[in-house]
Design a protein with these regions (language model features):
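Short, solvent-exposed amphipathic alpha-helices that sit
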Residues: 1, 74-77, 100-119, 162, ...
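Alpha-helical recognition/docking segments in bacterial nutrient-uptake
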Residues: 1-80, 143-144
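Short beta-strand elements in bilobed, periplasmic/extracellular small-molecule ligand-binding domains
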Residues: 1-7, 110-133
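Short acidic/polar active-site loop segments enriched in Thr and Asp
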Residues: 27, 88-89, 148-150
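Hydrophobic alpha-helical segments within soluble ligand-binding/sensing domains
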Residues: 67-92, 107, 111, 132-141, ...
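Short acidic capping loops at alpha-helix termini that bridge into adjacent secondary structure
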Residues: 88-89, 120-124, 174-179
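Flexible loop/turn connectors
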Residues: 136-228
């Protein structure tokens, strides 16, 4: 039996996992995210429970099975694309660096700027922990400045939709006043008008590989941790 565990926060997810473990309802777990100081990953690791992480891991990489795409390279290539389109003031909007995929995409964005002789500016980066954070003032200040960015790289499609809606409130036209590039090529990227330009990070293949590795390690428990 396959079970999907969701929760409002780490505590809810951890509680559900602990309940499943107590009732011997799972042979392994797949975490669809990776972040610093994650209590869920720490619990699974400390209890010696089989788990596979989708994303680059923050702790105990040599003892952890994980599947990752190169988010830094994806961030760099996305920023390169905006540079090649003629943009020289490129900003970044993303979730907290605690989420490692966002930290890596931001790092790639900064690498691209440096490669093109542009010094990354921290004031051009707006980051949030959740959508409940007070990010609107920071975005408004950035996007209405006289020398405002002409393009913005966004860590994922959901935030890009939020940004596009916020630009509408400010009277900014996409892409005439601000070009946006995001990541994931999810359903969210196709419900906006205009549709988002988004980088496909192959989530289906990542999920398939994570499931394959989980089954492989269940059937062969003495296998060493795999990094893909």
């Amino acid at each position: 039996m396959n079970t999907v565990i969701t929760g409002q926060d780490d505590a809810e997810v951890l509680d559900a996992i602990q309940s499943m473990v107590a009732n011997a309802q799972a042979d392994g777990f797949i975490l669809l995210y990776s972040k610093k100081d994650c209590p869920v990953a720490a619990y699974l690791r400390n209890e010696g429970l089989l788990h596979v992480i989708v994303g680059k891991v923050a702790q105990s990489a040599n003892q952890t099975i994980y599947i990752d795409n190169d988010n830094a390279l994806a961030g760099e290539e996305a920023a390169d694309y905006l540079y090649e389109m003629g943009h020289r003031r490129i900003a970044y909007f993303g979730v907290s660096n605690a989420m490692l995929f966002s930290a890596e995409r931001k790092r790639g964005y900064q690498m691209s700027l440096l490669k093109h002789g542009i010094t990354p500016r921290e004031e051009d980066c707006v980051e949030v922990n959740t959508l409940n954070d007070a990010y609107e003032e920071a975005l408004k200040s950035l996007l209405t400045a006289p020398d405002h960015p002409t393009a913005m790289l966004v860590s994922d499609d959901i935030l890009a939709v939020v940004l596009e809606q916020f630009c509408g409130k400010l009277g900014l036209r996409i892409p005439k006043d601000l070009s946006i590039v995001s990541f994931n090529n999810s359903l969210f990227s196709r419900i906006t008008s205009p549709q988002l330009t988004t980088v496909d990070v192959n989530p289906y293949q990542l999920g398939m590989e994570a499931a394959s590795q989980t089954i492989n390690h269940i059937e062969n428990p003495n296998l060493l941790a795999t990094k893909i």
